[in-house]
Design a protein with these regions (language model features):
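Short amphipathic alpha-helical coupling segments at ligand-binding clamshell hinges
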Residues: 51, 55, 132, 232-251, ...
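Periplasmic-binding protein-like
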Residues: 37-38, 108-120, 162-165, 202-245, ...
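Extracytoplasmic small-molecule ligand-binding "clamshell" domains
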Residues: 20-98, 168-172, 258-259
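Ligand-binding clefts/hinges and TM-proximal coupling segments of bilobed small-molecule sensing domains
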Residues: 22-24, 72, 143-166, 242-277
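Acidic, polar ligand-binding/catalytic clefts
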Residues: 57, 61, 66-130, 141-142, ...
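Bilobed "Venus flytrap"/periplasmic-binding protein-like clamshell domains
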Residues: 33, 38-42, 46-61, 113-174, ...
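Alpha-to-beta junction loops
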Residues: 64-66, 83-93, 134-135, 177-178, ...
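Bacterial N-terminal signal peptides
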Residues: 2-12
Length: 277
């Protein structure tokens, strides 16, 4: 293990680009080492099929380096045991935190209302009377759960734990389980983070509507900016990534749209027009 760790942390002292000359010693300069979950579709998977995998490929291409992953299942301690150990240098998608330094945001999205096609046509807010008494599935501790509590609808909700571990789990993620229960009519409605909801709904085998929650009060927030994450104080590395994100903005947006990620304008809760329009 020590030998492997040492190999991962080696940095060549040979001729490097300007990028390499200004990076902290902990960041490797010939390989983009990404911290990622091996089974968290549509975000990431070991086969490289997730949209964060595709975005990592774009960044590696822009930096002219190879791509390597350090795999760890998402859960408590993910950042500490990935970035914090020095075994990888970049988290592709994060909304920030005390022990992580975010790059500039590269997309903004929102929580969504997911229903079977046509069953709740016209419903765009959580206080809509049509939702009263309906069976609503969501992940415990998320902003929509707080909002439903404020509305006195908590008794109608089915709260799923945020993480599912163990060999007996039937679904790769909790969000996938919720969508499966919606498809099976165990739920009337699901409320999920948009970047996972769109793709999972499309994969469910049942036609579904995915409606971003754009008209809710500012608190609790339903829309969030997503950045990449690096270690604290790695400012040169962050600036290099910001440059790559800016240069490849159109490519990244295409990947997100291909995975049905609801994209919002930077400041307003309005759908983002395609850069190709």
């Amino acid at each position: 293990l020590n030998a492997a760790l040492g190999a991962l942390l080696l940095v060549s002292v040979g001729a490097r680009s300007a990028l390499a000359q200004h990076l902290p010693d902990l960041v490797t300069t010939d390989v983009l080492r990404v911290c990622s979950d091996p089974g968290n579709m549509p975000f990431s998977e070991r086969k490289g099929g997730g949209f964060e995998n595709k975005i990592a490929e774009i960044i590696a291409d822009e930096l002219k380096v190879k791509l390597r992953y350090y795999w760890l299942t998402q859960g408590p301690g993910f950042v500490r045991n990935t970035l914090g150990t020095g075994l990888c240098d970049l988290i592709i998608g994060t909304s920030g935190g005390d022990i992580i330094q975010p790059t500039n945001p590269y997309y903004r999205s929102a929580y969504t209302l997911v229903t079977r096609r046509g069953e709740f046509a016209g419903v765009t807010t959580l206080d809509d009377p049509k939702l009263k008494g309906k069976q609503i599935g969501l992940i415990a501790g998320t902003p929509p759960a707080n909002r439903l509590g404020e509305l006195g609808m908590i008794n109608d909700t089915h709260s799923y734990t945020a993480y599912a571990f163990g060999p007996d789990r039937k679904f790769q993620t909790v969000a996938a389980e919720i969508i499966a229960d919606l498809a099976a009519k165990k739920l009337d409605v699901a409320i999920l983070w948009g970047p996972s909801a769109g793709w999972l709904a499309k994969q469910s085998g049942v036609e579904m509507d995915v409606t971003p929650l754009l008209k809710e009060p500012d608190r609790p927030p339903m829309a969030f900016r997503v950045s990449m994450g690096v270690r604290l104080n790695e400012n040169d590395w962050k600036r290099s990534l910001n440059t790559a994100l800016r240069k490849r903005k159109t490519d990244i947006e295409k990947v997100l749209r291909d995975f049905q990620v609801p994209l919002l304008e930077e400041e307003e809760n309005k759908p983002l027009q395609s850069s190709n329009e």
